[in-house]
Amino acid sequence: MIPGELVIDDGEHTLNAGRHTIALVVANTGDRPVQVGSHYHFHEVNDALSFDRAAARGFRLNIAAGTAVRFEPGQTRTIELVELGGARAVYGFQGKVMGPL
C-alpha cells in the first residue's frame, strides 16, 4: 500500500449520502467551453454560465472528487449540486464570499 492510497470495494458507492442537494438549469451563454471542477463553489463559476446564482450559494457539483462537468457554448443542461460540508466557509475563487456562508 502507498501512503494515502485508498482501496475501494467493487460495486456502486453512494456519494454525499444524506446531504442536501438541489437541481439547477445552467446555460453557457459564452462562445467558449466552460469546465467546472467537483469542489468549485458553484455560486462563483464563470460569468458566462447563466443560472440562479443565489440558489447556488454554498453548493458544489454533486459529482465524484477530481472530476468535472464541461458546458459547451450554447449548451443548456440540468445539474445537481450538493451543499458544502465542513466549516461551511468559502475563501478564494472569485472572492464573492471570503468567509462563513
UniProtKB/Swiss-Prot annotation:
Record keywords, A-Z: Cytoplasm, Hydrolase
Q: Which GO terms describe its molecular function?
A: urease activity
Q: Which reaction does it catalyse?
A: urea + 2 H2O + H(+) = hydrogencarbonate + 2 NH4(+)
Localization: Cytoplasm
* SUPFAM superfamilies membership: Urease, beta-subunit
Q: Please state the pathway this protein functions in, per its UniProt record.
A: Nitrogen metabolism; urea degradation; CO(2) and NH(3) from urea (urease route): step 1/1
- Extract the Pfam families matched here: Urease_beta
The alphabetized list of GO BP terms reads: urea catabolic process
The main enzyme category here is: hydrolase
Kindly give the HAMAP family that the UniProt entry links to this protein.
Urease_beta
Q: Subunit comment for this entry?
A: Heterotrimer of UreA (gamma), UreB (beta) and UreC (alpha) subunits. Three heterotrimers associate to form the active enzyme.
Family recorded in the similarity comment: Belongs to the urease beta subunit family.
- State the protein's name: Urease subunit beta
Q: Which organism is it from?
A: Burkholderia pseudomallei (strain 668)
Q: Which gene encodes it?
A: ureB
